[in-house]
Amino acid sequence: MAVWDRLKDQAKALQQGQAGHGASGGHGGGHGAPRSGGGGKAQLIGLFKTQLGSLKNELKSGAYRDASMAMCALVAAADGQVDASERQQVESMILSNDVLQNFPPEQLRQRFSKHVDQLTANFQHGKAEAMQEIAKAAKKPTEARAVIQTGMVIAGADGHFSQAEAQVLREACAALGLSPAEFQL
């Protein structure tokens, strides 16, 4: 728990440092504005990558693996579709993610593909299935936060958070019992 508290303090310090740069705290106001600036979000994504890396040895459970793959698929399909190049790009990010290297690549690929296929066949049904998988990580707060951070790293990889990506991340926070404000959503 001490590791998470230290990392959370680092995130708060970063948030406070960004407060003067026009990103109005993260909750409320101008809905899309904080997501398009890049600078503050890019630093936050970098911090999340660092935090996830420092927790690598703790993030080895099947619940984290499955919830993370559901989260990645949900972020990829947030706009209701996933084309082949986007699917390949997200899959490459998953397979190169330091923390996710705790798991066999074929397991990750299989779980990610299952969720993407469900989401593209019937978005609402696939989303419900993905959220059920994500909610299973709520039992362990460190894993729950790591699932959201993993989703944010995937969503922020292109330097921009779409409204749809931010929305599914907020919904995942609710499924995990976490405050979206903790992640500047």
Indicate residue ranges for each PLM-predicted region:
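Small-residue-enriched hydrophobic alpha-helices in membranes
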Residues: 1-74, 84-185
